[in-house]
Amino acid sequence: MKQGKSFIFYCLVLLLCGFQQLSSAVTASIAKAIKTTDRKQRVSETLPTGLSYRRFYQHIAHLLGWVPAPDLVCRGYFKEPLILTEHPHPGPATKEPAIVTAKGPSMVTAQGVSILRKDVVVTQPGRIVEADKAYIYRDSKTGHVTKIILIGHVRLHEADKRIVADKGTLTLYPKTAILMNAAYHIYNGEPYFYKFKYPFDAWGIAKHAVRDASNVITLRHATYSTCKPTAPAWSMSATTLVLNRNTHRGEAYNMLLHIGRVPIFYFPYFNFPIDNYRKTGFLIPYAGHSSSSGWFFALPFYWNMAPNYDLTLTPEFMSERGLNLQSLFRFLSTKSSGTIYLNYLPNDKVFQQFRETTLSKFPPSVLAEHPVFIPYVDKLKKMKNQRAFFSMNETTLFNSEWSSRVILNYVTDPYFFQDLGGQLGGSSLANQLLNQIDLQYNGLHWQFMGMLQAYQTLHLISQWTTPALDQYSRLPDFNIVGYYPDIARHVDFNFNAEAVNFDYRSDFVPDKPRGQRFHMRPGISFPFYFASGYIIPQLWADATAYNITHFQPGQAHTSSRLLPIFDIDSGLYFDRNFHLGHRSFIQTLEPRFFYLYVPYQNQDRFPNFDTVLLPFSFEQLFALNQFTGNDRLQNANQASFALTSRVLDAQNGSPILTANVGFIYYLENQRVCLTPGCTPSNYHYSPIIGELTFYPFPYWSFTGSLAWDPNLGQTNNTSVELAYNNGGKKADIRYLFVHGNEDSIVTPTTLIVPGNAYSQNTNHVISSGAWPLLKKWNAVGYWDYNITERRTDVYSIGVQYNTCCWALSFSIRRTYAGLKVDPNGALQRQYDTAYGFELQLKGLGNLGTAPISTVTVLDAMNNGVSNDVR
């Protein structure tokens, strides 16, 4: 119903102009006839009494055009007349042609009252009016129609509404409508028959309905529901119900919420949405139980501040910890978008008890004997019961070349995620929070990025045997990459450079070197491509210089390194066609050879700011440096041999199978490593790496990789994943193993336990899935098992029953929260188990609104909250 232009005020007017005038003496008899009709219709045909509950709503469903369809989710649909479905967006009533038919005798006058009798039907494209009788009143002076009275089986159809009533009175000046004993069906957007939108449909009944000139509908003694009309699972009744399309909201006074036939809640006033327009108001509450926080209940409040930014405030009460306040601010402009999230606990009683208990176990005598605990205890003493987590993510696109990004994360104490991470939907093991501001340029030949980067490292006293590594800050870091192809025939130019100022602060690890590092690597390549392959010789000059402001013994204040790099990358391509059954395929064979030469230079005097040795991978066969970062450049005189084979569908080129295998043969021993005085490797072979990707059937995929070290007779790393993805049906299982490597990172020197705490194996089995069990049942699950530690790190299970008008979901999540000190001073595993429950009555709140905490914390953890940065 478009504001101020309802068809019912115009369609009859257009057809009455020009009719022959009859005597006005019949006016009194017409009025008497209307009164007589009113007395007869005190027993309503639209809302009959004396019917059973089931028969009554079957009657209402029939009036509103409900068609049973057991195979649909709602077990039926509202069928619209063909003239409505063919014209879902009708034009103004005053401009559309109209046809009026009536089977009985009629009296039409230019002044006074005109009468249309028996099956009166008025049609326009996208509009229909039906009634047993129609009385049209005209102004005696102007001849304009001022009022229309419809009596008996009144039906009003339009593209977003259907109303059935015993009687309707339509006044043109001002434009108002009054309906008696009405049943209504309203929806937004396309009719339900065509499109499923939220709220997909709303219907109800009313003893008295008024639509005023501002397009506001007021219903007296009315009901409202979005369920199927034959047996509504829920409905609300109210003495007064206001549906305002201008504000996109509904208001109910003295509202009773019914589940089936049973009233369960009374609200003196209730505000709810009547379309999918974002509007200020309360969202669906959620509740649950956590083993570390107790029972919790949250009631989110949504504030639609402007079309391009909004705020969600979620007060949450936890029986053990007290009040927890969460807020999410979202903003969007033509060039930028982002979120700001804050989680604040004004007085965490559980954390207060933890601090007091832990501090009592470490008196000065214990600290004197075990000084490793001193920084942990000092930090605990400074912490307060007020706890907070802040996260901000913002991206700006200035134009097609320039952009910026802001990632900010801060937590008041390192135990926040251990205590609340599982309940919030994130990781309880997170110990690195990224903070980064960068500016990027992406042009045709040049790319640039300047950034400020720092991590907040979380140190928990229960992790003293395997502490998190404090990270270097980059204040600032400038990186530039250039590429000019074809500067001459078969000559390409490459360039990359970086300038970084590394800063380091830590209370847990001794001071490390700080200073500036400058790196530059220009190169020239000579690509030659031919029909069955390619060969690309390349020559590079790798230059690195340091200016150390805080250095350790054996390190110089300034130092530099200049080394040449020479490599040859080459490959061949062969293919053949073959048939398997009725299908045609293409198989390729792609051998590849890569030679790399880098002379040796002792680099023990250089600091190690950010360089690590990652597990062996297929990409390392063709890398210029086995290390990531620029603090170490390997010596190399080596040849890589690799073979790739693909099987493609000959019809569309889609991949069926891809297999890779390769290894490196070292002509010289590798002498460069991360730590001074390390033992050089005298192996002639790298691990043998193999990869396989296979799509055996539609929706199925298998990926696997294995790096086997023949020198040590052990697996370097392996991963296997089997996945199924078919729309809403998703499942996968993964296995990941990485063998520990003591030379992968610098070993901290203050640990009182021997060896490198980070050299242990990584060995996990991870499985996840989302699956519709039945037509209305859905299940999701996630499981992460740590084989090395023989424990489940995370598992979660969720089940939802979903209908067209309500949904019920239940979830359980158990998260490993690290180690805690028991009363005897021993370390004990700690788990947090959270239960969640949510009932959604669709049409009374946001459809499927997830708790703010789960959404925002997961987003934050995907944008800067992680485990150790290696």
From Swiss-Prot:
Q: State where it is primarily located.
A: membrane
Superkingdom of the organism of origin:
Bacteria
Q: Does the keyword Membrane apply?
A: yes
Q: Where does the record locate the signal sequence feature?
A: 1-25
Quote a single Gene Ontology cellular component term.
Answer: transporter complex
| Keywords associated with the record | Cell outer membrane, Membrane, Signal
An example Gene Ontology biological process: lipopolysaccharide transport
Where does it live in the cell? Cell outer membrane
InterPro entries the record matches: LipoPS_assembly_LptD, LptD, LptD_C
Q: Which Pfam families match?
A: LptD
The record's subunit annotation is: Component of the lipopolysaccharide transport and assembly complex. Interacts with LptE and LptA.
Q: Which PANTHER family match?
A: LPS-ASSEMBLY PROTEIN, LPS-ASSEMBLY PROTEIN LPTD
Role this protein plays: Together with LptE, is involved in the assembly of lipopolysaccharide (LPS) at the surface of the outer membrane.
Question: What family is reported?
Answer: Belongs to the LptD family.
The name of this protein is LPS-assembly protein LptD
